[in-house]
Curated annotation (Swiss-Prot):
Pfam families: Transferase. Disruption phenotype: Accumulates fusicoccin J. One of its GO terms (molecular function) is acyltransferase activity, transferring groups other than amino-acyl groups. Its EC number is 2.3.1.-. The lineage of its organism: Eukaryota, Fungi, Dikarya, Ascomycota, Pezizomycotina. The gene is PaAT-2. Belongs to the plant acyltransferase family. The keyword rRNA processing does not apply. This is O-acetyltransferase PaAT-2. It comes from Phomopsis amygdali (Fusicoccum amygdali). O-acetyltransferase; part of the 2 gene clusters that mediate the biosynthesis of fusicoccins, diterpene glucosides that display phytohormone-like activity and function as potent activators of plasma membrane H(+)-ATPases in plants by modifying 14-3-3 proteins and cause the plant disease constriction canker. Optimum temperature is 35 degrees Celsius.
Length: 490
């Protein structure tokens, strides 16, 4: 497609952390399943209405590349049917979702834990034909940043939102979905103000508001991989991309399994605490996310658990959304749609992972994260990040293997999304029951296979019944052992 010129009201440069090399060719899709028949036109019109309000117009702008290679957004004076705020496509199928060859393969809740196929098989439901695959596809066309694809069955609806990662992280899209729901319900007055289009809270991060905060040294500075060791790490990582394949699957853990894992973790922590402090009965706190992370780390290490690999160092990397952690920079009741997720690190080894209890490992993860989330430590981490060329920090050793986690549980998508004004009629209720117009299931995928999606877990969160869904990318040899262990779970 050739680039189309439209009257432009404003041109806004991308922020450094949005225009990152690692984000440019990541085009994401979030697919939500509703067991209701939804009005596709109402979904489209309400989204376009939101993107015509105030600073929300920025999300309807077109991505362009400057002569120096940097990205910017061209915000039109107004949107028209020929140049809409969001790209819309609709597929209407005259059958029930379970009668469709691909629809019947969508994951559903069961009594026992289960491994499902990768969500990548559902590309047919995710986007229109010939979707954008790279940032260049946006720069060289009139495509809006946001794509809306609706698949209508006679008893259910799939709603997919696609966007370039340069526009936002998952929390930003959650904010979009919440405000979209408000417009759909005729509550435009409740739509949050989107942050100023030409500023970014992270610009003032290091000094703090007023520049009065004292700079601390980052707690993990001595563990940074730099110099020749950094070069070795990069070479090893490139080698794994070339020679170590990855296989993606979706992990389903029922609510009762999560309760059992959490009870196991808490009981082992109480036992450990009583050994150190006799008579102490208080349970150290660990969250569902801590326990799931610890369990997933153990699953990822199963195929490496031998005497030869026990000393293999691992760096557990958790994504941190800094919006709620920096209240002096992020204003309340203001929407921030962008990339504000950064890394927290936990150092360990395969041997330590396999020899410690689930509770101890979960507590280790939680303790290391708590040490890194104070505002002064976040600022110290950003100071180190600004010194790097590649826009990422490597913690551990030159031979450390990264294990990456992104936890979307706090987005609470099945709770905060409310498309009930678009419900034409309820469909047949499945294993998971939700209120009309609320999702019963969701997954994410990339429009193009990502080589960097490896040794990673995306905790998608809970469905309305409290069951957890987790997407994972691991070497093929890891999955038989994981399946075997999952069969032992309650």
């Amino acid at each position: 497609m050739s680039q189309t010129t439209v009257p432009v009201d404003r041109i806004v440069p991308f922020h450094r952390f949005d225009d990152a090399i690692g984000l440019r060719n990541s085009i994401l899709v979030w697919t939500l399943r509703f067991d209701d028949v939804l009005d596709a036109a109402k979904l489209r019109d309400s989204l376009n209405a939101l993107l015509s309000i105030g600073n929300w117009k920025r999300l309807g702008g077109r991505v362009r590349k400057k002569r120096d290679g940097k990205l910017e957004v061209h915000i039109p004076e107004s949107f028209t049917p020929q140049h809409p705020a969001a790209d819309f496509s609709h597929t209407k199928l005259d059958c029930c979702i379970d009668e469709h060859a691909l629809g019947r393969r969508l994951p559903v809740a069961t009594e026992k834990p289960k491994l499902y196929e990768s969500s990548t098989i559902f590309h047919e439901f995710a986007t229109r034909e010939n979707p954008p695959l790279t940032i260049e596809d946006y720069c060289n066309s009139d495509l809006p940043q946001i794509g809306l694809h609706v698949v209508s069955f006679t008893d259910a609806t799939l709603v997919s939102v696609s966007w370039p990662h340069t526009m936002s992280d998952a929390v930003g899209i959650q904010t979009l979905l919440i405000n979209w729901s408000r417009v759909m319900a005729g509550r435009e007055i409740e739509v949050q103000h989107l942050e100023d289009v030409e500023s970014n809270p992270l610009d003032n991060l290091e000094a703090g508001e007023g520049g009065t905060l004292k700079q601390e040294e980052w707690i993990l500075k001595s563990s940074l991989v730099t110099g020749v060791w950094f070069v070795i790490w990069v070479i090893r990582y490139i080698w794994t991309i070339i020679w170590v394949s990855q296989e993606s699957k979706l992990i389903y853990l029922p609510a009762r399994t999560i309760k059992a894992l959490r009870r196991e973790a808490e009981d082992s922590l109480v036992e450990q605490t009583q050994t150190l402090v006799p008579g102490h009965l208080e349970k150290p706190f660990v969250s569902d996310g801590d326990v799931i992370t610890a369990w997933a780390v153990r699953m990822a290490c199963l195929h490496q658990a031998s005497q030869q690999t026990s000393q293999q160092s691992i760096t557990i990397i958790n994504a941190l959304d800094v919006r709620a952690r920096l209240p002096d920079l992020f204003k309340q009741n203001t929407a921030y749609v962008g990339n504000f997720a950064f890394a927290l690190f936990t150092k360990t080894t395969v041997g330590q992972v396999m020899s410690t209890s689930l509770g101890e490992l979960a507590h280790t993860v939680r303790r290391s994260l708590l040490e890194q989330v104070p505002q002064a430590q976040i600022r110290a981490m950003f100071q180190e990040l600004r010194k790097t060329r590649m826009g990422a920090l490597i913690v551990g050793t030159a031979t450390s293997s990264p294990l990456i986690f992104s936890n979307w549980s706090k987005t609470k998508i099945c709770e905060v999304v409310d498309f009930s004004p678009a419900v034409i009629r309820p469909g047949k209720q499945g294993p998971v029951i939700s209120e009309p117009g609320k999702p019963v299931y969701h997954h994410s995928l990339h429009t193009k296979r990502s080589q960097t999606a490896r040794d990673a877990f995306n905790i998608l969160g809970k469905d309305p019944a409290g069951n957890y869904w987790i997407a994972a990318w691991l070497p093929p040899c890891a999955w038989p052992r994981i399946k075997e262990e999952m069969q032992k779970l309650p």
